[in-house]
């Protein structure tokens, strides 16, 4: 294969050892990937921050957040992305603010105008909010920061989810995925470090305590850390229970929908706030099925519950139960009610649905007597709805009914609305009431409540102006509202629609829904608006159906998650949008009707296999031969493209191995070399018959691959022992006995010539050639024993007796020639060529012992009376030549550490095979032997001369 990589392995030789395959098991671990996410308790984007001011001018808070220009408030998410951290258990996250859509500021102006027509003056008096005795005061009232929620140090680890397809009921076209019924898991959501803190706060110098000034931009913040047990599932619930004097939100009432978001705007849990019980119940989404180890901390904006915490400068017990954890803290509350003011108003609350302003005005708290009282309301950017009958006038009969929180118990007030004529003008933007109602004078006190609805035609955020025109002074109070990025208003109830449909298994992969194809349960579906903000999420039911409800006209985005083990089918196949697949992400438009055409199809991802064979390559040719067998128990490891181990196995008794359930992609196969074996040659022939090496890279593309093989052969052992023993024994014994007796009376001429020639030549030649070339195990023992024994015994006995009276001529010639030739030649050549390791020790011992013994005994007796001439010539030549030649050549080529002895030995020894025992002599004693022989001959010659002389004398 082109994707294979040849790897060179080490070689080694271990002689005479049993090769064993050492197999180790390998376990695959699952790494948990830590994903840091930031969770936020949001207030569903329907709440506004509001500030109330009494100085007649608009003060814009720098801490206010932005809002889109739509009816509903939109929560903004910090654009910081989550940072994954695979090294630590948690990941630090940036603070994320879930802001409500509009930051509203209310500005109130109080102006007194004297009735003197000749000097009409307008004065504005301001004083510190802590001052209660000024007739005209500037106040800073409520700032709604209900959605200013920050999350810190939140982490979550993704879960692995397996989704199985279920049978689809194709008849249930309009059925909706039923919400999963979970259990209360207050005991599985754990809170710690709970605190209720005053954001900003105002220090009372008299008491030294920090107070919560509800109408001066202060808010309360509920803070806590939390962890969620991994056993929590989609549909499980937990609760936030607020106490008697404490609630979520701010001037704007908390929305019924209070969702829990992470930093990217994904919904973790959907909350429903019940104002009756002052409790929020959160239901977990499928987010908790996708992630483990979810933990974090949060801050949630909260407010004093005005209807219960009614009195300024009073400490109230702010209590909350988060899950099963309870916390309380006493907070001093001040609303800034100035009882000396003839006209003062406040925003009682802002409705979280239609953003209407529910106003409360206190008229004549000082109980002054007037002969003229005209109450006028002018709206800018708002309108009254006369048909709603929500302009109420209550007569105060008890001074205590002017509660500081501007939330009087109207059930205890006297409703006198019908006694007055309310005149609407200026397109319902102005309302006028004559509070004298025909009386000449009056000191009556009133509480007037109104509802102002946003005017969609307004280009600004509007304001509400009040005037109380009396016979003494004209008082004015103005309430203005502004947001940072535009108004978010609504007028009337819009019709809601549904969006969704179906996720199915496209078994034939044609991208179309067929009658026999079933739905897939458990697919995550996310709904987003046109700006990419997540609005909702759900999970397909057992029939593959899903549905989002309560949607207005507009453009939406739907995202489908890919179920485990599936692949998205072809998108937009054919022309029928109702039966095709719209892909993983699609856009749906709602235009005065439900849109139930957003489908997605998936087919089961094909799985492939990989593997083949590990064999014993006995002939080391790198090819699989029919006679070669597989190797059992070889460990094979499979890695993915990232180098992560995804499987291990061992070859079976036939050398086969296999990995299954693999996706198309890049892999690496690693063979663990068995102990005692050597990697054979790689890529020597066709891909399905060769060896691919110890590590092989392979790419699977829509097919199986059974060509990944590897071969090994056993390491060789060579034992070569060459022993050459050459024994040459040469024994040369030359015995010459010459007896010459000459008796001459007159003239005797005796010539005795004794020539003894002993020549011993011992040549021992032993040629042992041992050549061992073995690939596996060769034991060659070459033993050459050459024994050459030469025993030459020459015995010459010459007896010459001459008796002559006159002339005797005796000639004795003795010639003894002993020739012994022993040739011993030892040539040991040991040549070992091995792939392993051969250590050849060549020891050549050549011992040549030649013993040549020449014994010449000459007895000459000469008796001559007259003249004797004796010439005795004895020539004895003993030549011993012993040549021993031992040549040992050992050639060893090896890579490993094993030893092979080779001992050629050539030995030449002296052995005697005659009965006579001669002294042991070496070749270096030849000169000594010759001297002895010549000495004997000279002695014989002397005897003859003496004998001849004596005969002459006798003569």
UniProtKB/Swiss-Prot annotation:
Protein topology in the membrane: Peptidoglycan-anchor
Ranges of compositional bias, category Polar residues: 56-71, 84-114, 133-164
Keyword set includes tRNA processing: no
InterPro entries for the chain: Adhesin_Fg-bd_dom_2, Adhesion_dom_sf, Fibrogen-bd_dom1, Ig-like_fold, LPXTG_anchor, SDr-like, Sdr_B, SDR_Ig
Record's compositionally biased regions (Low complexity): 115-132, 920-935
Maturation-removed propeptide residues: 922-955
Calcium as UniProt keyword: yes
Cellular component, GO annotation: extracellular region
Annotated GO biological process: cell adhesion
Ranges spanned by the short sequence motif LPXTG sorting signal, renumbered to the chain: 918-922
Localization: Secreted, Cell wall
Region Disordered: start-end pairs: 51-166, 678-935
Listed Basic and acidic residues bias regions: 72-83
Main location, first listed in the record: secreted
Keywords: Calcium, Cell wall, Peptidoglycan-anchor, Repeat, Secreted, Signal
Spans annotated as Ligand binding A region: 51-495
Signal peptide span: 1-50
A Pfam family the protein falls into: SdrD_B
Modified residues (Pentaglycyl murein peptidoglycan amidated threonine): 921
The family this protein is said to belong to: Belongs to the serine-aspartate repeat-containing protein (SDr) family.
Name recorded for this polypeptide: Serine-aspartate repeat-containing protein C
